[in-house]
Every structure is written in structure tokens, then in C-alpha cells.
Amino acid sequence: MSKLDADYENLVKRTRAVNRQLRIELFNISEKLPDIRRKPFFGQFVNGMATESLGPFPEFILPTNPCNRTLQGYCSPCFFSKVPISSLLREDIYNSLVVQTQYIIEHFDEIVIGFQSREDSLKNKFDVTFCYACNGSLFSDAETTQSTRKQAFQMLADEIEKRNLRPLTYIETCVTDYLDFLSSNEFDIIFPLLKKLNAVICFGFESANDITRNLIYLKNLSLIDFEKAVEINTKLGIQPAAFLYSGFHSMTQNEVINDVTNSVAYLTSKRVMPIIMYPNLQEYTLPHLLYQAGRYNLIDPRTALMIFENTDAITKRIAQDNRDFWLMGDLFGGPPAPPTNFFNNKYKISCSCCTENIRNVLQQIRQSHDSSLLSICKKSISNCECQLKYKDMLIEEDLTYGRKDIIERISENIKFAEQYCADYLAYMHKKEKAQECQK
């Protein structure tokens, strides 16, 4: 092993250790449910839009056992770190997948049909669109079992068939779990159900860049495995999609823009639909620790707008029949939605007026997929004085922080996190006690 490889592996190991320390503390103080979860997280229907979803339709997140990767210290920004876990036995928790799916079926008119808010061309092609997911990976045997997965998929397929609906179902999973599924005896049982659900398999991917994906985000995913899963899905006639993150620590905002843009281009070349995930700031995560110490900042609203503009321009080049070109995760993020997002971030450069304009147009585009709204928004914010401040910030970042080698930046942040972690946890405990006293 070369010194560079050894340094890389050492950074991965140390980052995982920091993440585990934060998550163990969180699990120790988190609410432990005395029963299995009876219904999934599915957000609310606000201003004609399903919240906490990937688009103008509901997303059902059915937590069972915690995600293995969370417990192992992977996925540093983890959105689901604060999802309560159950105190019941493992087998009872596994069964909650079926219980929560039954809740969806019993309330189908209200939370599936009632949460449809498409305004684009696909509105007339699909009667219902929804996303179906666990905390981490639906095909993970640590989170669900073959028998509960089969039962849950069968229940959904039967309900849709009974109602004579044309579905589009987004299913979230980890690449390696999905590869295990493809080579297992479960495949012959589940695959026909996936076809009945008109499934799009959504992989956690985050970035096409190895350093960004596996060192900053800590995804622990090889490009070889990802491309293998995509190739198999293509041969099977199942559309693949992939999540792309846009809030990496240790990077300048120009670097984030370029990283996401290059990743969108890579996915599009493989005919994989990109799902843009804007960052929020979950407590007890490495990004939150670095943010509290002034060593990380959320992307500016103008950066978010530029990321989508680039995504839209690239994905328009390759049309996908009867599918979305792209999806955009909830701008405020959850569950549970954290207190801080890139719109209310106190360190953002964009003024409150431009921030509001950007937020409104991104919300509208999520629902309508009408990217022509971009030009209206860009015109409204182009002459504001914060535009010049934003450009100056990008230049300043690139000339100072951006001149350092990326590995050096990451190493400095991890070293700081190791030293600061105890103080951060003490700060969080003090903050939570103060909040309890105010109740």
C-alpha cells in the first residue's frame, strides 16, 4: 500500500470513529419507542406540495432496525440520525415494515392519492407516484427480511392492481444490498412485484468523484459496484436513479457546484436519473459539529439555484420515456426536519428577498418541473447587491481555502473534530437541557 493509500484509509477510519462517537451519544439520549412503529413518516401536504419527499408525490419512510451504515460510522451527513428506534425485539421490529405498509393501504385515498400534486406531462401517464423507503436501504437484511419485503411489496402491488392504477414507484436502496438481492433466491419472487409497481430503483451514490463520495461523504461505495448495478437494471428493464449530495464539508462552493454538475453528467451518460439532495444540518453529525465551530458552511441559496440550473441543462439532452428527467429532494429536509437549512442559515450571503425568491422558484419547479421559471428568478435576483457579494465570496473561497490540497483540508477538519468532539457534545447537552426547561 502506498503512503497516499495509507493516509486515505487512515482518514476513513478516523472519520468513522468520530461519526460513531456522535451517533452512540445520540442513540443514548434518543427516545426509545416501546412499540413497533404503526405508521411511516410521510410528511405533510402544504401549499399543494408533499413535504419531506422527492417531488410532487408522497414519500413513505418506514423505519425498522437502524441502518447498518449509520451504526458503522458511514454517511457523515446522515439525514435519519434522529429517527427514534424501538426497544422491542429484532423480529418484532422487522414486522413493522408490514404494519406500516398496511397503514399506507388503509389510508390510500388520503395519503397516496391525496398527496399527488404533479403538474407536469407525467400527470396523465401515471395515476399515482410515490416513494417507498426505509431508514437506509430497503434491501438490507439488517433493516428488513426477505419475508417482510415480499409481503410488503405484494400488499402494495395487490392494492394498486385492485384499484386498476398506473403506478410509478421510487424504491430507495444501497447498491451493495441490491446486488446481493439480484444474486439471491429472493430475486425470482420480488422481481415480478417490482415490475407490477413500475419501480425505479434509487441508489445512494452522492458523487461520481471517489474522494468526495468515499472520503468526505463516507459512502463506502465503489464505482465498479455502482456501474454493475446500473448495467443489470438496464438489462432487466428497470430504470435506475441515484442520489447526489450537494453539501460536502472541506470544499468551496465552486467545488461543490462542479462536483454535482460532473456527477449529473456522469449519471446522464449512463441513463441514470439524478436526484438532487440539498443539504440540511442534522444535529449530532460531523457537518453540524464543523458548522458549530465555524469550519463548515451550508451552500448559499444562489449556489443551490446554480446546481439545479446545471442539472436541468444536462438532463434535457437525454429524454427518458415515461420517467422524470430529475428529482429534487425536499428543500428543508427530514425526517425529522432540522432547525437549520440553507435558506435560514445565518451565514448565507444572499439577502432575505433573494433567498425568498429562490426558495419559491425551487419549490414551484419541484412540483411543476417547469424549468422555464429559472429565467424569471435569475432576472429578479441579478441586480441585487448581494449578487456581487456572492461572486466575491466565491472568488475569496477559491483563492484562500480552495488553494489547499483537498486531502489536507479534510485531514485538518477530521483532526479538529477529534479534538473538539467532547466540547461539542457538552454544548449539545447544555442546549437540550435549556430547551427542556423552556417546555
List the model feature ranges, each with a label.
Residues 224-285, 303-331:
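Conserved C-terminal portion of the radical SAM core fold
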Residues 146-157, 185-192, 198-200, 252-272, ...:
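Short, electropositive alpha-helical surface patch
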Residues 47-103:
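Canonical Radical SAM [4Fe-4S] cluster-binding loop centered on the CxxxCxxC motif
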Residues 81-104, 111-148, 159-181, 198-225, ...:
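Core AdoMet radical
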